[in-house]
Amino acid sequence: MTTATPAKTKYEAIIGLETHCQLNTNSKIFCACSTNFDSPPNTNICPICLGYPGVLPVLNEEVLASAVKLGLAINGKIASYSKFDRKQYFYADLPKNYQISQYDLPIVEHGFLEIELVDKKTKEVTRKTIGITRLHMEEDAGKLVHAGSDRLAGSTHSLVDFNRTGVPLLEIVSEPDLRSGQEAAEYAQELRRLVRYLGISDGNMQEGSLRCDVNISIRPVGQKEFGTKVEIKNMNSFSAIQKAIEYEIERQIEALENNEPIYQETRLWEEKTQCTVSMRKKEGSSDYRYFPEPDLPPLEVSPEQLEHWKHQLPELPAQKRSRYEAEFGLSAYDARVLTDDRDVANYYEAAVAAGADAKLVANWVTQDIAAYLNNNKLAIAEIVLTPQSLGELVQLIETGTISGKIAKEILPELLEKGGSPKELVAKKGMTQISDLGELEKIIDEIIAANPKELEKFRSGKTNLKGFFVGQVMKQTGGRADPKLTNQLVDQKLQG
């Protein structure tokens, strides 16, 4: 699908996200069944999560604590009084034929989240605030496995696994403040950073721990009324969120340009075709016939409880980014990269605490170590090079004991085997040559051995300076102090 640029500039996209975050509690939201993802099908079930007659649910307090902590992290208003409701619908993976959720009195309302948008070319960071309508608690449904296809259409039969039934979820509903696929993907990533920093979820989209539904409409620029809203499901990565939105924006613009109707419907993103396809007519809240859950009492959060949970909050990603910029003098981009993962941020801070320069450590973590982790598909907690050893390596460069080139040469061995950089440098005899007399002697010998190059240099071919510097580096095995070598070569060649 292609759309002319002039048509794109006539319209703007109005986008909101509904994000479901699966919590990492040991037991389900209303019963004691395990939430283990890898268990065999239909083994983590009981009469409560299967909805047998006469059973009574009991709220897992950890779910409430997680909801309040995330509510505080998104700058929301925590309700002192809220309740659960029954959301009624029929589907094969919902054994009770209703889902316990929250409707008109959610646990959190009126929040916001600041996102950062990175220009890929300049690495410049701009910030935007996205409103959050509400956050509420609910139970997950089961899971259908379609044999012979990844969708119901085309499958020979379907199997149902109720292990996921009753697993606790937090649903976070944004305001329609997003305007592009990039903004939506970044918003979802910032939510994932929050839940990981809080330790309440692993935020793994591939395993369904974080699921995003997109609501999107198009309207002419300047128009206040919203267009017809379309929901998009089935996106299991941040890039899929961005691509699905970009496709849907083009599809809706093309429909408007051709005077074709846009229907209020739910559409699925198909990764294989890179398209959205119609799934069903979109339901409204009245279709679910919500009413208060009679088997659960209302929830009351006391001021004392709220203060207790506030004190348990860690330093959050946005706070850490601001501190890195102010305390360490890092760019907004480097601060963002370092704080994307809490373990990476902790590693970085430990290396700086060992006495190394904050900016130099940032360069090593975001470039060389990040490349090693990416190439070997490792988390930073899995490498044997301790942050203290990285700090020691950086300090060897700062003091002139070794050059940056030598540091890069020994880094692979340190990453594979660990140990002390100082001891490794001494063992290999790789200490940087910074002695003036020793370097002068080497340079004199090289100039004497290359009279033709010297004559050409003095005749105007000044780029031959690099030849002489290269010969010094070659003769010393890269151990010559680069700055001092350049200065001395300049002096000798001009003399």
UniProtKB/Swiss-Prot annotation:
* Catalysed reactions, as listed in the record: L-glutamyl-tRNA(Gln) + L-glutamine + ATP + H2O = L-glutaminyl-tRNA(Gln) + L-glutamate + ADP + phosphate + H(+); L-aspartyl-tRNA(Asn) + L-glutamine + ATP + H2O = L-asparaginyl-tRNA(Asn) + L-glutamate + ADP + phosphate + 2 H(+)
Q: Entry's PROSITE patterns?
A: GATB (PS01234)
Q: Which GO terms describe its biological process?
A: glutaminyl-tRNAGln biosynthesis via transamidation; translation
EC assignment:
6.3.5.-
Which SMART domains would you find in this protein's record? GatB_Yqey
Q: Record's Gene3D superfamilies?
A: 1.10.10.410, GatB domain, N-terminal subdomain
* NAD recorded as keyword: no
The record's annotation in InterPro entries points to: Asn/Gln-tRNA_amidoTrfase_suB/E, Asn/Gln-tRNA_Trfase_suB/E_cat, Asn/Gln_amidotransferase, Asn/Gln_tRNA_amidoTrase-B-like, GatB, GatB_C_1, GatB_Yqey_C_2, Gln-tRNA_amidoTrfase_suB_CS
Q: Which keywords annotate this record?
A: ATP-binding, Ligase, Nucleotide-binding, Protein biosynthesis
Q: What class of enzyme is it?
A: ligase
What Gene Ontology molecular-function terms does this entry list? asparaginyl-tRNA synthase (glutamine-hydrolyzing) activity; ATP binding; glutaminyl-tRNA synthase (glutamine-hydrolyzing) activity
Top-level division of the source organism's lineage: Bacteria
Q: Which HAMAP family match?
A: GatB (MF_00121)
UniProt function note: Allows the formation of correctly charged Asn-tRNA(Asn) or Gln-tRNA(Gln) through the transamidation of misacylated Asp-tRNA(Asn) or Glu-tRNA(Gln) in organisms which lack either or both of asparaginyl-tRNA or glutaminyl-tRNA synthetases. The reaction takes place in the presence of glutamine and ATP through an activated phospho-Asp-tRNA(Asn) or phospho-Glu-tRNA(Gln).
Q: Which family does it belong to?
A: Belongs to the GatB/GatE family. GatB subfamily.
Spell out the subunit comment: Heterotrimer of A, B and C subunits.
What's the protein name?
A: Aspartyl/glutamyl-tRNA(Asn/Gln) amidotransferase subunit B
